[in-house]
């Protein structure tokens, strides 16, 4: 039985116990969430991982995407990115290589990492078709399902599957047009294949078979957002909403079959549309976990997109999004370095916490403790509460004040020290 089937029968598994303890909730809260499709625990029978729960009533989780490109294939650097992501506190990885030996890269990432690992089988299927047959449009759909099973057996915990791209979504995209085009690689690959071959998306047409594969290997199904906007001006358009509605219906089918489900959301969206998108997803999917890709709330800040995404992620989390995909400073410019991966994870973790302060009041306890530590000029306590104690300590130690209680921002005129002489806080 899958964990969904166990939960529906009232059984509490070891995985549920682990997540309940880490989240500070009851085991039955987790069980009921999984049974209802509101919570997932990405799993795999093929390797041990650090389990995390994603969904309603739990802390917002952060994913870090890594992987080679056709221009840069450096496996050791990708492994270092995986290490840096874990060091920075990411909850999961997505291995999205589009260059090199896909099997070897993904196997090594899964062997090295303690985190849940996600993948996009469609990438490998289409790129191998381009390498071996002369173009992505010559992909054999049977190969797509074989690759899906192959990746599951490597120990992949969740997969982004582009099921919601069908004739209806493509028609709406074509009729409507866009300012920023189609930016999802999976969406672009599948749309090109459908139009060239005059065939329906096999992931949609053969969805029952896909679910059988994922269920057999206990893989969580993350419904890919192939029609997501690549520019804020295109957000919340007909193609994106059509895809969401299709994926919502398919998610019910998959959950009823015993497969855990997540739905992916926007990547570029104005700030004032975020809450609407989260509420819409939660409504039409019966509160299934929502995975926001960033999101970026302006398109004019290349080089700073980790900060732009952190703004969007904090609002998304506060509105009810459950899972955030990080963005690095290199977004839209280059393949990120390990250092940029680390910074991207940190930015997203801060954003996730900011959102959690709104929807999960108990997460404010750390901020309360920091307030007390600052009031008391207790620097060690401040470091301990910090999201990145090493960086905080390093900055202060590089510019130590004459008075060890204070810092060089205020020096002799530290507001806290002045007030301490007057009030007994």
Curated annotation (Swiss-Prot):
Q: Which gene encodes it?
A: thiC
Q: What is the protein named?
A: Phosphomethylpyrimidine synthase
- Biological process annotations from GO: thiamine biosynthetic process; thiamine diphosphate biosynthetic process
The record's section on PANTHER family has: PHOSPHOMETHYLPYRIMIDINE SYNTHASE, CHLOROPLASTIC, THIAMINE BIOSYNTHESIS PROTEIN THIC
Q: Name one GO molecular function term.
A: 4 iron, 4 sulfur cluster binding
InterPro entries in UniProt: ThiC, ThiC/Bza_core_dom, ThiC/BzaA/B
Role noted for this protein: Catalyzes the synthesis of the hydroxymethylpyrimidine phosphate (HMP-P) moiety of thiamine from aminoimidazole ribotide (AIR) in a radical S-adenosyl-L-methionine (SAM)-dependent reaction.
Annotated positions binding Zn(2+): 268, 332
Return the similarity comment.
Belongs to the ThiC family.
User: What residues does [4Fe-4S] cluster bind to?
Assistant: 407, 410, 414
């Amino acid at each position: 039985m899958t964990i969904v089937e166990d939960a529906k029968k009232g059984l509490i598994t070891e995985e549920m116990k682990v997540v309940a303890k880490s989240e500070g909730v009851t085991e039955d809260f987790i069980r009921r969430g999984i049974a209802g499709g509101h919570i997932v625990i990405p799993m795999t029978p093929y390797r041990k991982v650090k389990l995390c729960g994603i969904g309603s009533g739990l802390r917002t989780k952060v994913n870090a995407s890594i992987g080679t490109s056709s221009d840069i294939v450096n496996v050791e650097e990708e492994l270092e990115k995986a290490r840096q992501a874990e060091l920075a506190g990411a909850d999961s990885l997505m291995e999205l290589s589009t260059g090199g030996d896909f099997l070897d890269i993904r196997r090594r990432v899964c062997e090295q990492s303690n985190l849940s690992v996600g993948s996009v089988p469609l990438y490998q299927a289409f790129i191998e078709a381009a390498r071996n047959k002369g173009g992505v449009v010559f992909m054999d759909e049977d190969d797509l399902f074989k690759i899906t099973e192959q990746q599951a057996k490597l120990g992949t915990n969740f997969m982004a599957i582009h099921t919601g791209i069908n004739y209806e979504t493509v028609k709406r995209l074509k009729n409507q047009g866009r300012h920023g085009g189609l930016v999802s690689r999976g969406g672009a690959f599948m749309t090109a294949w459908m139009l060239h071959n005059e065939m329906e998306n096999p992931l949609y047409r053969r969805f029952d078979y896909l679910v059988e594969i994922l269920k057999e290997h206990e893989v969580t199904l993350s419904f890919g957002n192939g029609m997501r906007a690549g520019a804020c001006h295109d957000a919340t358009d007909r193609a994106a909403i059509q895809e969401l509605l299709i994926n919502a219906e398919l998610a019910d089918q998959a959950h009823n079959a015993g497969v855990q489900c997540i739905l992916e959301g926007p990547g570029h969206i104005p700030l004032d549309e975020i809450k609407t998108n989260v509420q819409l997803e939660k409504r039409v999917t019966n509160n299934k976990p929502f995975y926001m890709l960033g999101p970026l709330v302006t398109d004019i800040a290349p080089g700073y997109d980790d900060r732009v995404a952190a703004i969007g992620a904090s609002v998304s989390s506060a509105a009810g999004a459950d899972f955030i995909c990080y963005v690095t400073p290199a977004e839209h410019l280059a393949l990120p370095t390990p250092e940029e991966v680390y910074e991207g994870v940190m930015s997203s973790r801060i954003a996730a916490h900011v959102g959690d302060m709104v929807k999960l009041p108990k997460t404010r306890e750390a901020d309360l403790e920091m307030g007390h530590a600052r009031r008391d000029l207790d620097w060690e306590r401040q470091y301990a509460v910090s999201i990145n104690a090493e960086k905080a300590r390093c900055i202060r130690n590089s510019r130590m004040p004459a008075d060890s209680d204070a810092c060089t921002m205020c020096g002799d005129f530290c507001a806290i020290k002045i007030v301490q002489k007057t009030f007994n806080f």
